[in-house]
Amino acid sequence: YEINIDSIFNYLIKGDGNMSILSVNHLSKKINNKIILKNISFSLNEGHIVGLVGANGAGKTSLMKVILGYSDYQEGNFTSIRQDENHCNIGALIENPGLYPFMSGYDNLKLLNESNSTGPINKIVDDLKMNKYIHNKVKTYSLGMKQKLGIAIAFLNSPKLIILDEPMNGLDPKAVRDVRQLILNKAKEGSTFLISSHILSELVKITDSTLIIDKGKIIQEVTREELEQDEEQDLENVLLDIIDKEE
């Protein structure tokens, strides 16, 4: 019997890909009797990249805020990888990330760096090609620069679960490419992703599967393979067809 050392190493580093990092069960939320989230259930396995796609106001950000503990809910439950006393296992980019405008981008990262070394900061700055402006004050940054800094913060301490709300907003095509590659690389190392967008085509190249959300409800989960079968169609029309069938 031949032992595959590479397989054993990958298992020890990443696990077998079946470990549940996040499990959401029948989650519901209301505000003043208005349904925000309705009976949502799904799970994320280790190393997987899952998209969350829907129109503006469909419930994407609300769901992410509940999972991150920024918002309450009335029914259901969820379990996620536990926070370690000395390590943050969850990284997040949510709308309007809290950046310190009168500090440099580098100093913003230093505040949140768990390592005694600046190596992790320099690595993420290189990966996102932020070197030219990382030492400038954040108040001078464009929208795209701030977005990349928010993404850098989410990735900084190599969390096991990374939740990204509309990460491609404000990014030029080169930056989108860099972020996609970073996501794919981190997933290979074992990080798990939940990534939202209102544009299906933004995510299809990197996600293992995509959850379609409409009016606070998950109406369908589609795999990358299923979407690739529709590659001759406009993916946004595919998304609209899925939503229309539910109405």
Where are the regions that the model predicts?
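The feature captures the beta-strand-to-loop junction immediately N-terminal to the Walker
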Residues: 53-55
